[in-house]
């Protein structure tokens, strides 16, 4: 009995330690989506196309609200929102959680600073090939920076939440510097 449990534990540790590959690559068109979302505890309809009309968008997928890694990541995005906004970008988190759970999460973990979207039918998760391999009912931890033209600028995939915010900010700064001055 111990050997199968030990093997399962080792496999789960390995799955967390290894980075995953983001499905969409730079230059690819990001799938458009409209989904229920929550901000500051209030629900609304979120449209990626509408958000992109105002500037670049960070779309980050996360496995489950109120789990330690997802709460850490949401808190880090919340703390960094002034930096994203100063660079003209918005952020949306996407998970397969139901909208009621995400309404609470939008207040508690996201500090009412950015919306989180419910993809309970896994339509967006599948379109972005962002299903967690070991648990397909959950989203993987993948972040994308999408330009106003709908093309992927950068992506970062790792189950470890630590570098998603800094990686997206660095990519956003680099993209912003490459834009012609108006």
Give the residues covered by each predicted segment.
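A short beta-strand-turn-helix
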Residues: 34-56
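Cleavable N-terminal signal peptides
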Residues: 9-10, 20
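Structural microenvironment flanking redox-active thiols in thiol-disulfide oxidoreductases
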Residues: 71-110, 122-125
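Thiol-/selenol-based redox modules, centered on thioredoxin-like
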Residues: 138-182
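Short loop/turn microsegments at loop-to-beta-strand junctions
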Residues: 31, 56, 140-142
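Short active-site neighborhood of thiol/selenol oxidoreductases, capturing the structured segment around
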Residues: 48-77
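Bacterial N-terminal signal peptides that target proteins for export
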Residues: 1-9
